[in-house]
């Protein structure tokens, strides 16, 4: 109450910020007359003037009014678009590293040019991040005209580009690209063998378009570069026969033995998307697997030799019971393609993790592709937090403002609209069954069609969009279907969705990023005419003018009919996605309306609010076909959505807490890798490793400060001979001297090791041997880091069970991950020392050839996939793109094959006396800095 009273007097923080920015807008507007008088060359010359002032120490904040005024004038001349005052406010919000919430149609693409231009003046690079290649290319080509006019270079970073093209794109002042590609480039940069092979510069400033989609919706799905692991294809096929033989149990057994309505072999938890075998289910599965010869007679599924079979049993069960064709995936060209649950788009190339995708392939009887092994991974949360400054824009961020602030430290500012919104959001209508709901939707669509009002119908799955399409065909209503199956036609369909009588069905936010203009998009049609060289210039002008005249008539016709009408066929689990659908109507002050039609069969209502609403309907004795339309029900649904949002936030936060552990370790490894790449000579590092390893070996058989009776000299001699190629007569030394000490034995072994090393260096020269050492070191670090990631995955999967032992799983994970990391560092030292000590050199040429072989293979990777997988639950998508620019290093003389990949950003350095980022409390030099 007090807060509300104070807000009335002083305004909310959002209002105060907007008012503060309006003062700066007044300053910019005052400069407009002066800037308008400049010639094109003088306007372009302002960029060089600004750059010199920045180089001389002037801050970007101080430069902002002039730079924004110049950018606005350039946009007016080149793009024929002048930034509105509210767009200037949006630009300031982005420059100050915040999130700008701007309604659909308010010109977010144009807003981004202001902070991008200003920050590009510093010369450290600016990244503009979009959700797909189409938008990245469209925006880059569109805005490049403005930036090039002002003397700035623009690069586009797309998937599948050549290495040289990527380097050029990142070297530009401004780089447009997708979130996936920026993240994968970072991982690849930290898998290269030469500093010249990197593509990214330091991560300076990023403007993220559709920031909610990238930093919230996709935050649970890490980017993963993986290679093929062991093949279990046949096992998936055999396991696919199991689920149809098992029956679902209805109801959960309570402590008193009641609650089970129908006994069965497994139970489903739809909220958690998990399936569990019951006791009878275990027995039945074991009996069937024994009959098929997959386990021994009378053996348990939990026997050590059968534990991997459990993974396959549950993968097959989940594939059959929780993942459904045309809802969660489609089968296309003999492949299982995931459908994005947020946008309804097909995610070609992405794969589910934990063997789920292979199980679904077995279920659909298509070719089963092999499982993968992680080579490198990072979450978007940790990738984007590495930028020195981060900003974002979207039409719907306010509902997630707390999460943006909590996870990323980003404040959300709601930008006022240029014109007051006129959209009417009607109350939800709730029906008992899906049939009644669809009947009501068809009635509403028919009514709009007869009045000439365009309709956009939002569905949550391909299955629902095709069902609705079938119903519309039955009643003879012409329509367009915009779902993942029509991806190529998406932009064209959306552009025309505002024409009179146009009916468009879209899965969730398909077509996001393209405006729906009332009356249709004349600009797009005009562009086609402009691009047709067969049409004479005067004919082009006549046709384009005719187009614009027709558009004016249609535009007024649609406005008179009420503008675009939005129909939602069910509520999404996130209010934000619902708001995005509504936001397609009422752009730039146009009229519009929206309404959601729900049924008690909808997953959200069934799981979270169904019983309450059903009891209300029963008490009111609602006849068939009658809808509830009441605030209390709408509030009940929004309450259910808030519960789901809170649960999803907890999942993302928990994922981040776990991922922070591996992220800190990743920083250490990548920093040390970069230091290795940049060092001219790593002799000191190799020598320190050798001394440490040899000391450990000797101490194992001749403990420090011990007496002769405690020594095991024959075993020491054998270990040195077999593992380190050191043939020393230590027993003779002991026999000849009655007073020899453990320290003297260590010195003798160390001297022999140093001499052997120096002899190899002398044979080929310091430079050649150092290049070989660097290659070996990088190959070993990468291979053991890859194995460490797999170990962390396994640790993660079972760590929740520690809770049953009254232990904190997060603390246990942190402790054990630290122990695994320390063991990995020791293994790196052991492995590198062993290879360098054992390498047999015949000639300098042979050594150079070996080093080149490692590096060449380190720059090319076969059978590599780029995945966007979900650790949090195996039902999340994994992107797999066969790699052109990733890496394998395999050298017979060095050890087992390792898989690798291209380019990366710079890590913030950790000082040697700073606390170690792993959280152990020790200094970095005494902890994970030991390797350097």
From Swiss-Prot:
The keyword Cell membrane applies. It comes from the Bacteria. It is an enzyme of class 7 (translocase). Its main location: membrane. Signal peptide: none annotated. The keyword Zinc applies. Keywords: ATP-binding, Cell inner membrane, Cell membrane, Cytoplasm, Membrane, Metal-binding, Nucleotide-binding, Protein transport, Translocase, Translocation, Transport, Zinc. It holds the Pfam family P-loop_SecA. Zn(2+) binds at residues 916, 918, 927-928. ATP binds at residues 87, 105-109, 515. Coiled coil: none annotated. GO terms for cellular component: cell envelope Sec protein transport complex; cytosol; plasma membrane. It catalyses: ATP + H2O + cellular proteinSide 1 = ADP + phosphate + cellular proteinSide 2. Its EC number is 7.4.2.8. One of its GO terms (molecular function) is ATP binding. InterPro entries: Helicase_ATP-bd (IPR014001), Helicase_C-like (IPR001650), P-loop_NTPase (IPR027417), SEC_C_motif (IPR004027), SecA (IPR000185), SecA_CS (IPR020937), SecA_DEAD (IPR011115), SecA_motor_DEAD (IPR014018). One of its GO terms (biological process) is protein import. It is a peripheral membrane protein. Belongs to the SecA family. PANTHER family: CHLOROPLAST PROTEIN-TRANSPORTING ATPASE, SECA INNER MEMBRANE COMPONENT OF SEC PROTEIN SECRETION SYSTEM. Monomer and homodimer. Part of the essential Sec protein translocation apparatus which comprises SecA, SecYEG and auxiliary proteins SecDF-YajC and YidC. Part of the Sec protein translocase complex. Interacts with the SecYEG preprotein conducting channel. Has a central role in coupling the hydrolysis of ATP to the transfer of proteins into and across the cell membrane, serving both as a receptor for the preprotein-SecB complex and as an ATP-driven molecular motor driving the stepwise translocation of polypeptide chains across the membrane. This is Protein translocase subunit SecA. It comes from Burkholderia orbicola (strain AU 1054).
């Amino acid at each position: 109450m007090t807060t509300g009273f104070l807000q009335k007097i002083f305004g909310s923080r959002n209002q105060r910020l907007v008012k503060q920015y309006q003062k700066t807008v007044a300053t910019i507007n005052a400069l407009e007359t002066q800037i308008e008088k400049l010639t094109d060359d003088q306007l372009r010359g302002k960029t060089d003037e600004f750059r010199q002032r920045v180089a001389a120490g002037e801050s970007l904040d101080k430069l902002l009014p002039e730079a924004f005024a110049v950018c606005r004038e350039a946009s007016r001349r080149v793009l024929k678009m002048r930034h509105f005052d509210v767009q200037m406010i949006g630009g300031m919000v982005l420059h100050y590293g915040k999130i700008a919430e701007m309604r659909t149609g308010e010109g977010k693409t144009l807003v981004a040019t202001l902070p991008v231009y200003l920050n590009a003046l510093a010369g450290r690079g600016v990244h503009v991040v979009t959700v797909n290649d189409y938008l990245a290319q469209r925006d880059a080509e569109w805005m490049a005209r403005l930036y090039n006019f002002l003397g700035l270079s623009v690069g586009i970073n797309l998937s599948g580009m050549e290495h040289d093209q990527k380097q050029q794109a990142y070297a530009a002042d401004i780089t447009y690209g997708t979130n996936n590609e920026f993240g994968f480039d970072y991982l690849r940069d930290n898998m290269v063998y030469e500093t010249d092979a990197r593509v990214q510069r330091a991560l300076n400033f990023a403007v993220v378009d559709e920031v909610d989609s990238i930093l919230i919706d996709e935050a649970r799905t890490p980017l993963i570069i993986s290679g093929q692991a062991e093949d279990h294809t046949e096992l998936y096929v055999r396991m696919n026969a199991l689920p149809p033989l098992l029956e679902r149990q209805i109801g959960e057994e309570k402590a008193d033995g009641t609650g089970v309505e129908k006994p069965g072999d497994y139970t489903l938890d739809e909220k958690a998307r998990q399936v569990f075998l019951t006791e009878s289910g275990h027995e039945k599965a074991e009996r069937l697997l024994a009959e098929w010869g997959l386990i021994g007679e009378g053996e348990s599924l939990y026997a050590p030799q059968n534990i991997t079979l459990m993974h396959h049993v549950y993968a097959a069960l989940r594939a059959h019971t929780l993942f459904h064709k045309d809802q969660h995936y489609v089968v296309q060209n003999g492949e299982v393609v995931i459908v994005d649950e947020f946008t309804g788009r097909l995610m070609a190339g992405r794969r589910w993790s934990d063997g789920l995708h292979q199980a679904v392939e077995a279920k659909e009887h298509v070719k089963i592709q092999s499982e993968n092994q992680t080579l490198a991974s990072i979450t978007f949360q940790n990738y984007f937090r590495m930028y020195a400054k981060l900003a974002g824009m979207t039409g719907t961020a306010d509902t997630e403002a707390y999460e943006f602030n909590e996870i990323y430290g980003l404040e959300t500012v709601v930008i006022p609209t240029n014109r007051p919104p006129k959209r009417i959001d009607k109350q939800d209508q709730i029906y008992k069954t899906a049939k009644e709901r669809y009947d009501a939707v068809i009635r509403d669509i028919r009514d709009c069609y007869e009045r000439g009002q365009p309709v956009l119908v939002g569905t949550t799955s391909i299955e629902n969009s095709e069902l609705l399409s079938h119903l519309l065909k039955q009643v003879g209503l012409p329509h367009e279907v915009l779902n993942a199956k029509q991806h190529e036609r998406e932009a064209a369909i959306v552009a025309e969705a505002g024409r009179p009588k146009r009916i468009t069905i879209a899965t969730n936010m398909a077509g996001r990023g393209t405006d729906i203009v009332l009356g249709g998009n004349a600009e797009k049609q005009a562009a086609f005419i402009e691009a047709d060289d067969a049409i004479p210039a005067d004919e082009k002008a006549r046709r384009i003018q005719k187009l614009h005249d027709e558009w004016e008539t249609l535009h007024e016709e649609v406005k008179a009919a009420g503008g675009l009408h939005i129909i939602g066929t069910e509520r999404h689990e996130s209010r934000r996605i619902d708001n995005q659908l509504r936001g397609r109507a009422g752009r730039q002050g146009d009229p519009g309306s929206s309404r959601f039609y729900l049924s008690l069969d909808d997953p959200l209502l069934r799981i979270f609010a169904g019983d309450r609403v059903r009891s209300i309907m029963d008490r009111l004795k609602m006849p068939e076909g009658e809808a509830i339309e009441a605030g209390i029900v709408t509030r009940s649904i929004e309450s259910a959505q808030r519960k789901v949002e809170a649960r999803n936030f907890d999942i993302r936060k928990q994922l981040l807490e776990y991922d922070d552990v591996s992220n800190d370790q990743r920083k250490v490894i990548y920093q040390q890798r970069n230091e290795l790449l940049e060092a001219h000579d790593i002799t000191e590092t190799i020598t320190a490793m050798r001394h440490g390893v040899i000391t450990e070996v000797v101490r194992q058989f001749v403990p420090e400060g011990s007496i002769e009776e405690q020594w095991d000299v024959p075993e020491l001699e054998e270990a040195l001979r077999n593992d380190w190629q050191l043939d020393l007569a230590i027993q003779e030394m002991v026999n000849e001297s009655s007073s020899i000490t453990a320290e003297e034995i260590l010195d003798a072994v160390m001297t022999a090791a140093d001499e052997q090393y120096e002899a190899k260096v002398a044979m080929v020269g310091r430079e050649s041997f150092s290049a070989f050492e660097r290659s070996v070191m990088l190959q070993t670090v990468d291979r053991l880091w890859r194995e460490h990631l797999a170990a962390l995955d396994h640790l993660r999967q079972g760590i929740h069970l520690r809770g049953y032992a009254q232990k904190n799983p997060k603390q246990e994970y942190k402790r054990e991950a630290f122990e695994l990391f320390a063991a990995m560092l020791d293994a790196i030292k052991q492995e590198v020392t062993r290879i360098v000590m054992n390498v047999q050199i015949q000639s300098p040429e042979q050594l150079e050839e070996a080093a080149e072989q490692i590096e060449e293979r380190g720059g090319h990777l076969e059978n590599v996939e780029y995945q966007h997988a979900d650790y949090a639950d195996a039902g999340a998508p994994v992107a797999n793109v066969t790699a052109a620019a990733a890496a394998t290093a395999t050298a017979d003389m060095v050890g087992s094959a390792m898989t690798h990949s291209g380019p990366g950003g710079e890590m913030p350095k950790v000082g040697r006396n700073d606390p170690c980022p792993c959280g152990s409390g020790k200094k970095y030099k005494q902890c994970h800095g030991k390797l350097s």
